[in-house]
Structures are given as structure tokens and as C-alpha cells.
Amino acid sequence: QFAMLEALHPGRIDVGIGRAPGTDGQTAMALRRSADALGAEDFPRQLLDLMGLLGDIRTEHGLWDRFRATPVAVTSPMIFLLGSSGYSAELAGHLGLPFSFAHHFDLGSRDDTLRAFALYRNRFRPSPVLDAPFAIVSANVLVAPTVEEAEFEAGPGRLLALARRSGRFEPIVSPEVAAADPGLAMARSLRTGRLVG
């Protein structure tokens, strides 16, 4: 589908690829049906295979020897390596890919983000798709006319983060219900990747 989108809109399609399963462990296991399929050891090879299928062939004997993404586009979608760790930052730099840091993860901090970007820049090697490092950050941002209003609106998300860290998956509540919750003070003290103001 990404090859089709790129053929329809050349130079306007980005593809974000990351190691994370995109869900909780139980759901990932149900979808992949094997604990072996959950490992990250094969990720660099899988990434190179995908890059090859989309036209960026850097190694010999990959999936692209047998398969072709169709339609064959004149250009390839830009692949961004998504990550929340130094490993992903270094891999993106090594392959000369754009990097997107997941600051929005609940455990993200400014220092984690800066450290990942420094690793990315230090490991960056120019590639067929990128001459210089290109990094972006994904963050949960909540804004309102005043800081007080933003903090009020952020209450449900803060409580949800606290519940998830405790292994509970609860429905999100209204800002009014969150404001009355005794756990909100603790939720505000958690280190999160949210920017509120």
C-alpha cells in the first residue's frame, strides 16, 4: 500500500518503522503466535528487507530478489526509524535514515530525548536517502488558554498513565471526575513524556 501511495503522491509519503509491537504483550503474542516472533534480534534484517522492497537496496540477497512492491514507483516513500531507545537511534544513524524519537511514551524525559538525538547524530552516516541527520520528536502536547485549564484537562491522561503503570487498563474519565480523584496528585508527580501548558 505504501508503494501505491508513493506512486499517487511522489515525495509526500513517509513510513514509520519501529521495533515495538504496537500493543501490550498478550495481544502481540496472540497476533504473532510465537514468542520467537516477538524478539527484536531480527529487526535490522527485517528493516533492510522492507527498505529493499521499497527500492532502497543496500545488501545482497534480500526479499527484493523474489518480490517487488507494486506499482513500481519512480520514488520511494521516506522511511523513518521510530524509537524510544539508544538502540534505535544508533541504528537509524548507522543506516542514514531519518529518526523519530518517541518522547510521548509515558517514561520519556527531556534527557532521554536529548541523549537519543546525540547518539543518532554521532552514529549518522550519509546514505542514498539522506545526506545529513534528520530527527523529529513525537510528544503528547496539551495546550489551553491558561496553565490551570491545561492541567485540568490533562487530569484524565495522567490518571490513565498511573493506572497503566500499575497494570490496570481502565476507561478514561472526564476532567471533572479526574479532578476529584485522590490519585491525581500522585499521577502529576510521575515522570511522563507529556507537555502541558
Give residue ranges: language-model regions.
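Acidic (Asp/Glu)-rich catalytic clusters
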Residues: E6-R12, L91-G96, A118-L130
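Structural preference for beta-strand elements that scaffold enzyme active sites
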Residues: R12-G16, M78-F80, P98-S100, F134-I136
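An alpha-helical appendage that flanks or caps ligand/catalytic pockets
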Residues: D36-A69, S109-G197
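A conserved active-site cap/scaffold subdomain adjacent to cofactor or substrate pockets
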Residues: Y87-L114
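Glycine-rich beta-alpha junction loops
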Residues: R19-P21, G83-G86, F105-S109, A139-P145
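Flexible, glycine-rich active-site loops centered on histidine and acidic residues
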Residues: Q1-R58, F99, F105-L107
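Catalytic alpha/beta core domains of metabolic enzymes, predominantly
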Residues: L5, F43, F80, Y87, ...
